């Protein structure tokens, strides 16, 4: 489960954004 409305196959520990990529599992900045 990734952040955002839509799941992403390539999730990275970067900043979570809703509405536009990247959708990440763990929000840690931008």
UniProtKB/Swiss-Prot annotation:
What's this chain's function?
A: Alpha-conotoxins act on postsynaptic membranes, they bind to the nicotinic acetylcholine receptors (nAChR) and thus inhibit them. This toxin binds with high affinity to both fetal (alpha-1/beta-1/epsilon/delta subunits) and adult (alpha-1/beta-1/gamma/delta subunits) mammalian muscle nicotinic acetylcholine receptors (nAChR).
* Transmembrane domains' residue ranges: none
> In the record, which positions carry 4-hydroxyproline?
7, 13, 21-22, 27
Task: Tell me if Coiled coil is a UniProt keyword of this record.
Answer: no
Note what the entry says on domains.
Answer: The cysteine framework is IV (CC-C-C-C-C).
Q: Which organism does this sequence originate in?
A: Conus ermineus (Agate cone)
Q: Name it.
A: Alpha-conotoxin EIVB
Instruction: Return the Pfam families for the record.
Output: Toxin_14
Q: Which GO terms describe its molecular function?
A: acetylcholine receptor inhibitor activity; ion channel regulator activity; toxin activity
Keywords for the protein's UniProt record, in alphabetical order: Acetylcholine receptor inhibiting toxin, Amidation, Disulfide bond, Hydroxylation, Ion channel impairing toxin, Neurotoxin, Postsynaptic neurotoxin, Secreted, Toxin
The answer to keyword Membrane applying to this record is: no
After translation, the protein is modified as follows: Contains 3 disulfide bonds. They are not added, since framework IV presents two different connectivities (I-V, II-III, IV-VI and I-III, II-V, IV-VI).
Modification type Glycine amide: residues: 30
Q: Which InterPro entries match?
A: Toxin_14
What would be one Gene Ontology cellular-component term for the protein? host cell postsynaptic membrane
Q: Which family does the record assign?
A: Belongs to the conotoxin A superfamily.
The record's account of tissue expression is: Expressed by the venom duct.
Q: Where in the cell is it found?
A: Secreted
């Amino acid at each position: 489960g990734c952040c955002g409305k839509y799941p992403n196959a390539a999730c990275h520990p970067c900043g979570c954004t809703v509405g536009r990529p990247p959708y990440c599992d763990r929000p840690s900045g931008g």
